[in-house]
């Protein structure tokens, strides 16, 4: 009895899945296999394929002509829509005309069921070519391409549901996808838009060290000899430096000179030699020229005491009073020694000593060491250990120097002296003015500073009738008499009175009995005033050496 295979067509799908289902091929071996027992309790499995008796080849009826035409039309529409979406693949397929023309030539000679099988194989070959040509090899490569036709997917899904799966057979390995190729997605430009504005930032400059001419390393040299003399005696001290300075280095002198030869800046990306930082060199002294502060060898001079006071008023005048350093050369000058007509090759300066060409060369560039900030102060720094009871100072003055005396008191207070003045102790002084003045006059440990001015001379030597209305002048006259009595009682020797000439005062304004002592000027002699209050001498005598050896020559 002949059987016919009914075909169900699902019109809801875009492509009928049942029409794309390939017809199973039957072999004589399958006819000899007995049918598997049909057990009701057995769970349905994908491997249990033969649940119904297989169709014999003798009982097989060909598919109707209408179904075959419908299948061919669906396949043609699927291929046409696929090549419209992927036109580049159509060119690749056309190039392989030798391999693709053979199945097409055989379609007319084969039966309809075999023609469909060859068409399905061709579609599978197109799918493998599409997977190999796909440029997406990233983490989303396992996802299906939305542009693929649904006919292929429906054909495979329908085939797995309605027909048994073939057994895996050993065969040639399928064509694998191309290996991962670096694309723009793996670089710094993978972001479509620069959110943080990184591309607009300037590229960083090379790391350099900010140093000045005085901070450059140099060889150890003597401060008592000219550098040119030491270069002749010790030629190994000369440092070989690169010939071309870097125009971008902040220590380069030409970087700050608008008219210099290196005024133009090198664009970013050019190489900068690492040794360009040490290109800043100075010219050695010419023969016969001695650096400032340099002296010939001989006995050491008498050492001088240098004070380090920290007065606010002294900040403006300290460079002129205490700065004994060498005059520094300006940073915008670059010196080179005379070449004497012979110039060394530039590339030889960067080579090691054993690879440099031998022969007469120009003297190499040498960096002159930075002179000390205070070369004359070669003694040992020490702090004065003046006891607290010897730091008391009392000042007597007239009203014409009141404002200047306040600055002078501030100078003494900053330097550690307990200075007493009637302006700062007016409340205590108001209890008993005479007793307040005598407390400082009778204490022999208190140093008394006399502020000399034209008004002071008038107050101490004028008639008392002229001071009736000036109470401060009367107190100044009383203090002057007490000091004069002490001076006479000490045998006309001055132990603690320090006359200081304030502005607009001359030495003729000093009282007669004080002219036989040291008279200082403010603010010119502030250092000497501090030394006098510290009971220290300005110059310290050198240590005593041994007696000379005498050579006795007999007659």
From Swiss-Prot:
Claim: Transferase is one of the keywords in the record: yes
Keyword set, alphabetical order: Inflammatory response, Transferase, Ubl conjugation pathway
A GO term from the CC aspect: cytoplasmic vesicle
InterPro entries associated with the record: E3_ubiq_ligase_TRAF3IP2 (IPR053047), SEFIR_dom (IPR013568)
Region of interest called Disordered, as start-end residue ranges on this chain: 1-46, 82-189, 308-380
Pfam families listed in its UniProt record: SEFIR (PF08357)
Protein role: E3 ubiquitin ligase that catalyzes 'Lys63'-linked polyubiquitination of target protein, enhancing protein-protein interaction and cell signaling. Transfers ubiquitin from E2 ubiquitin-conjugating enzyme UBE2V1-UBE2N to substrate protein. Essential adapter molecule in IL17A-mediated signaling. Upon IL17A stimulation, interacts with IL17RA and IL17RC receptor chains through SEFIR domains and catalyzes 'Lys63'-linked polyubiquitination of TRAF6, leading to TRAF6-mediated activation of NF-kappa-B and MAPkinase pathways.
Protein name: E3 ubiquitin ligase TRAF3IP2
């Amino acid at each position: 009895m002949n059987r016919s295979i009914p075909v169900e067509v699902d019109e809801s799908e875009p492509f009928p899945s049942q029409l794309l289902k390939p017809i199973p091929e039957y072999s004589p071996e399958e006819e000899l296999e007995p049918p598997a027992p049909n057990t009701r309790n057995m769970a349905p499995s994908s491997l249990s394929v033969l649940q119904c008796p297989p169709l014999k080849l003798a009982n097989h009826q060909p598919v109707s002509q209408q179904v075959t035409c419908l299948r061919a039309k669906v396949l043609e529409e699927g291929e046409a829509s696929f090549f419209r979406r992927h036109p580049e693949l159509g060119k690749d397929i056309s190039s392989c005309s030798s391999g693709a023309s053979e199945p097409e030539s055989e379609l007319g000679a084969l039966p309809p069921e075999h023609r469909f099988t060859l068409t399905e194989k061709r579609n599978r070959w197109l799918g493998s070519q599409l997977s190999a040509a796909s440029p997406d090899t990233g983490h989303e490569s396992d996802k299906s391409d939305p542009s693929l036709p649904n006919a292929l997917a429906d054909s495979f899904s329908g085939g797995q549901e309605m027909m048994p799966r073939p057994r895996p057979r050993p065969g040639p390995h399928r064509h694998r996808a191309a290996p991962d190729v670096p694309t723009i997605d793996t670089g710094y430009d993978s972001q479509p838009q620069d959110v943080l504005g990184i591309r607009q930032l300037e590229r960083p400059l090379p790391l350099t060290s900010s140093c000045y001419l005085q901070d450059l390393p140099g060889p150890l040299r003597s401060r008592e000899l000219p550098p040119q003399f030491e270069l002749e005696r010790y030629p190994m001290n000369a440092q070989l430096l690169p010939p071309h300075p870097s125009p971008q280095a902040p220590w380069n002198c030409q970087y700050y000179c608008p008219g210099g030869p290196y005024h133009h800046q090198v664009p970013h990306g050019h190489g900068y030699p690492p040794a360009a930082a040490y290109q800043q060199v100075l010219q050695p002294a010419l023969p016969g020229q001695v650096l400032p502060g340099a002296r010939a060898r001989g006995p050491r001079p008498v050492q001088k005491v240098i004070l380090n006071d920290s007065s606010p008023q002294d900040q403006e005048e300290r460079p002129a009073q205490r700065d004994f350093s060498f005059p520094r050369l300006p940073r915008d000058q670059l010196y080179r020694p005379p070449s004497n007509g012979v110039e060394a090759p530039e590339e030889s300066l960067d080579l090691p000593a054993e690879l440099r060409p031998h022969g007469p060369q120009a003297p190499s560039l040498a960096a002159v060491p930075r002179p000390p900030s205070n070369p004359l102060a070669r003694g040992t720094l020490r702090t004065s250990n003046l006891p607290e009871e010897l730091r008391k100072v009392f000042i007597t003055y007239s009203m014409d120097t009141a404002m200047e005396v306040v600055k002078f008191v501030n100078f003494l207070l900053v330097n550690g002296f307990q200075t007493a003045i009637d302006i700062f102790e007016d409340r205590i002084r108001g209890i008993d003015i005479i007793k307040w003045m005598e407390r400082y006059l009778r204490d022999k440990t208190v140093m008394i500073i006399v502020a000399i001015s034209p008004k002071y001379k008038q107050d101490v030597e004028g008639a008392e009738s002229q001071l009736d209305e000036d109470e401060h002048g009367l107190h100044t006259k009383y203090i002057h008499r007490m000091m004069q009595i002490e001076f006479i009682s000490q045998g006309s020797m001055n132990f603690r009175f320090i006359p200081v000439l304030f502005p607009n005062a001359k030495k003729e304004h000093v009282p007669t009995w004080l002219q036989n002592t040291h008279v200082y000027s403010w603010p010119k002699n502030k250092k000497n005033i501090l030394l006098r209050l510290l009971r220290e001498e300005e110059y310290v005598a050198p240590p005593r050496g041994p007696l000379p050896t005498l050579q006795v020559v007999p007659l």
